[in-house]
Amino acid sequence: MIFDKVSLNEGNAYNQKTGEFTATVGGVYSFNWKILTEKGKYFITEIVHNGNLIAYNHCDGRGISSGYASSSNQAIIRMKKRDKVWIRTHGGNGIFAHGGWCDFSGYKV
């Protein structure tokens, strides 16, 4: 997934073209992401570290009668310099994510 609205990108660790966060130095990093979907839709995402699945985020609006559903998750990951983290859809299960209301953040702890 590419989060195209970037409000802060200290050190340019987030690549807006690829959606990848690249560690500029080694250490422990915290990552958070939020997904919003509308009534009747769902969207499943994964956070990935160098191609390895770390955690899921399942946003399910199929059981609500109106409005939107949101879901968030956090992952703490030990990274080496130049390691990459990104968010991807899970196994083709992404049906609808409400663009401007989804976000991703990462920082060194």
Please provide the spans of the model-predicted regions.
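Extracellular jelly-roll beta-sandwich "head" domains, especially the C-terminal globular C1q domain
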Residues: 1-109
